[in-house]
């Protein structure tokens, strides 16, 4: 059923209809459209368009339709309706006859779809927040189990300083906490209702839009009708949240892909999140992580695409804005799937402590400790930095770690070096000295775990 037609003397070309129709993707807004219609029917009673009995009939029919949709949402796709609004109205008329034609009084699809999409976004943000916190919890639990797993930390993908696997996990907890904060902020700005703004200039009926907003679970109504039907900031903001969140998950995936590689060998992934090769029997591929990394690009693309769609649009509504949904749905579905998959990857991961420790003892990751030792002996840091660089060259020449160089060799570079240097160069000393807030010392890591557990109510 089309919601327009009196102005036209020819039927739409079937090719145009297929090009124009949006039901194939906006069917996902069915529940929100029905809920919004129930609230609108109540508002129409307050301005005398509907009687209380008429509203009751409409609400009962809409609630029946809501249950039918929840039981079988795919039924919607069997229709040739233009969009979800047409489908809902058509089904309502089937149930209550001519009365159903009164529901759209004072309402436009412009404010209707803006409301539907905001309601959907609010629900989806809550799902994302739950999944985000579940992944944070999984990381904290993994950190707690691996506080003593010493491994190399990297800069430029070269061994830099020793850290722990727990400290690595907690780095991603921080990223996810920022993602959580962004979603919470987005939810605040989402929480205003555009319903009652009409096509662009507002409704001609004296509806209490604040009351209407409250019925729909919004904290308030929007302030400007022209902006309300044109606004897709919440789409851009959610896509931005998703883009940043997926960058974090992609980096998480890349780290673990490397840690899982034969070259690093720091972790082994569970069979449940890996796959094999059709040719090479020995292969155990980190497909879950590679897909997380790969899916990051499609989310970035959705954000860029939506920005380009909106950048040249005049006020108010334009059909271009129909393009707001497919990219958003796909991006948020993808982000949600990847959050769940990342948590699954951590469930069953094995950290190979001996291999991690061996790697941490290689690559001269304790060079900074030697520089700090020299500073404590009164050597200016820049000079100490140069001295240690020369000592590393000598250690490489001898094929030894720094702590294995004889004292006489170390003293060639600085006479202030004494026997007390060797305890300083141990891995444990390297960790213990990083005791400022946020550092890798065991005490700081334990504190960070406790803080995260308290925040997440674990």
UniProtKB/Swiss-Prot annotation:
It is an enzyme of class 4 (lyase). GO terms for molecular function: argininosuccinate lyase activity. Pathway: Amino-acid biosynthesis; L-arginine biosynthesis; L-arginine from L-ornithine and carbamoyl phosphate: step 3/3. Keywords: Amino-acid biosynthesis, Arginine biosynthesis, Cytoplasm, Lyase. The keyword Cytoplasm applies. CDD domains: Argininosuccinate_lyase. Pfam families: ASL_C2, Lyase_1. It comes from the Bacteria. GO terms for biological process: arginine biosynthetic process via ornithine; L-arginine biosynthetic process. Its EC number is 4.3.2.1. Belongs to the lyase 1 family. Argininosuccinate lyase subfamily. This is Argininosuccinate lyase. It comes from Salmonella typhimurium (strain LT2 / SGSC1412 / ATCC 700720). The gene is argH.
């Amino acid at each position: 059923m089309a919601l327009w037609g009196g102005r036209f003397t020819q039927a739409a070309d079937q090719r145009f209809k297929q090009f124009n129709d949006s039901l194939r993707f906006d069917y996902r807004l069915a529940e929100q459209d029905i809920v919004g219609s129930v609230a609108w029917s109540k508002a129409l009673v307050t301005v005398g368009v509907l009687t209380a009995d008429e509203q009751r009939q409409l609400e009962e029919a809409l609630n029946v339709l809501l249950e039918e949709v929840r039981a079988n949402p795919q039924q919607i796709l069997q229709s040739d309706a233009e969009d979800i609004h047409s489908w809902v109205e058509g089904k309502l008329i089937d149930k209550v006859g001519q009365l159903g034609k009164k529901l759209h009084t004072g309402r436009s699809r412009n404010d209707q779809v803006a409301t539907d999409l905001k309601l959907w976004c609010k629900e989806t943000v809550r799902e994302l927040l739950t999944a985000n916190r579940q992944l944070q919890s999984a990381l904290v639990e993994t950190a707690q189990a691996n506080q003593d797993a010493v491994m190399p930390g990297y800069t430029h993908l070269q061994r830099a300083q020793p850290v722990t696997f727990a400290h690595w996990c907690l780095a991603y907890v921080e990223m996810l906490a920022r993602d959580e904060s962004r979603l919470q902020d987005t939810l605040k700005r989402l929480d205003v209702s555009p319903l009652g703004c009409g096509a662009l200039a507002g409704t001609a009926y004296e509806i209490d839009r604040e009351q209407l907003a409250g019925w729909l679970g919004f904290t308030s109504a929007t302030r400007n009708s022209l902006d309300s039907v044109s606004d897709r900031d919440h789409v851009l903001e959610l896509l931005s949240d998703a883009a940043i969140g997926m960058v974090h998950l992609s980096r998480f995936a890349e780290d673990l892909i490397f840690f899982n590689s034969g070259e690093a060998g720091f972790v082994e992934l569970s069979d449940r999140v890996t796959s094999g090769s059709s040719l090479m029997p020995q292969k155990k591929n980190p497909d879950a992580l590679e897909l997380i990394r790969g899916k990051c690009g499609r989310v970035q693309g959705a954000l860029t695409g939506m920005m380009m769609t909106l950048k040249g649009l005049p006020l108010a509504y334009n059909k271009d804005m129909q393009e707001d949904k497919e990219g958003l749905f796909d991006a948020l579905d993808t982000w949600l799937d990847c959050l769940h998959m990342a948590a699954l990857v951590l469930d069953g991961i094995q950290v190979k402590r001996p291999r991690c420790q061996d790697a941490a003892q290689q690559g001269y990751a304790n060079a900074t400790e030697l520089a700090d030792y020299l500073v404590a002996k009164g050597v200016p840091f820049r000079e100490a930095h140069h001295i240690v660089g020369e000592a590393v060259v000598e250690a490489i020449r001898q094929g030894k770690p720094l702590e294995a160089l004889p004292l006489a060799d170390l003293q060639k570079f600085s006479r202030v070096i004494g026997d007390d240097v060797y305890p300083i160069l141990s891995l444990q000393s390297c960790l213990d000295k990083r005791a400022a807030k946020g550092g890798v010392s065991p005490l700081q890591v334990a504190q960070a775990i406790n803080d995260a557990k308290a925040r997440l109510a674990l």
